[in-house]
Amino acid sequence: MISILLLIAAQSASTRLPPARALPPPTGDEQAVLNSANALLSAFNTGNPVEVLRWVYPDGRVTGTGTLPSRSGVRSESWAQFTQRLGNSAFQETISDPAVEVDGDAAMVWAPFVVRIGGKVSNCGFDHFDLVRENGIWKTMNLTFSSRITRCPAQ
């Protein structure tokens, strides 16, 4: 019986992954990355398609998964398609407690968000911005988010 347990333990030990390597040390660009993501959110909140397109790469995508008040599942569209739906000044999205990672000219922001429409919580989830720096300017390539209509803060 003990030999069987030792054999099982040996097999499970051999399938473990090696420890993850730590990310490079912070470069000091985290605030610039966060400023870019916040500028994009500000453009969403004012419903300004021109300003949104200023902070993104046109070839990027907006992809959502989960539940919204009107639909569920995976949704994906270009930034141009996304901006065509802007204009509702009652829409307000906020993020909190962002995690920012930077490696050279690539970065990401991961943060919980809450969307309010007319001051009432509509949905919440997590945003994942992936950003690229070109000519010293951080722009969002893609925004991917989860969404739910229950268990949201202040709901």
Question: Where do the protein language model's features map onto the residues?
Answer:
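N-terminal, post-signal-peptide region of Sec/Tat-exported proteins
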Residues: 42-81
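Sec-dependent N-terminal signal peptides of Gram-negative exported proteins
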Residues: 1-13
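Short, low-complexity N-terminal intrinsically disordered segments enriched in polar/charged residues
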Residues: 11-50, 54, 58
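Surface-exposed, charged secondary-structure patches
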Residues: 32, 61, 73-122
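Solvent-exposed loop/turn segments at secondary-structure junctions
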Residues: 49, 59-62, 115-117, 146-150
